[in-house]
Amino acid sequence: MRIVFQGDSITDAGRDKRNYHDMGNGYPKYASEILTERFPETDFEFINMGIGGNRTDQLFDRLYTDAIAFEPDVISVLIGINDIWHRYSSGRIETTDEQIETNYRAILKRLRAQTNAKIVMLAPYLLDCEKVDHMREELARLLPIIRRLADEFADAFVPLDLLFDEALKQQPEPLYYSGDGVHPNANGAEFIGRHLAETFMGIIEK
């Protein structure tokens, strides 16, 4: 079973770009380890093609070489936060909410048309950190768009925003999962990986 992880720096997580089987230090590492342990008889191939800094338009541009060409059985997609982040970066790339929806829809339509993969979407999130407070209103507008696309295209959806909100009620330390509100530390990566692995299990066991 071939599983492709696709996304931005949260997925990339320091992986070796010369070796797409390298999971890096992020959630793909944890998800792949959990699945390998849970299904020891399954012949998994895990491929991490996340690229740090990517927006939805950039993911679409590399979708064939970095996703479709692998002929995945399952693909997970975590993308969208950089479309907001880059509105404030030095380059100030102004991607509108409508453009994000158009880009993301194009990604999903192409995956549906050109692969037989089960599609798992993950919601972008912002954790409790002053560094990202200026982005919260924009993420609040983006999340319903992503949920609507998930209803239309995805086989499964991981609501990371809600899952983190609930987890932080039990672990209120803001820096427990991330130092900057976006990029997970080991605790955050394990949290995402565990929830994604549980979602994959639901697909594998069908």
Predicted regions and their residues:
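Alpha-helical cap/lid subdomain in secreted, periplasmic
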Residues: Y30-T42, Q58-K206
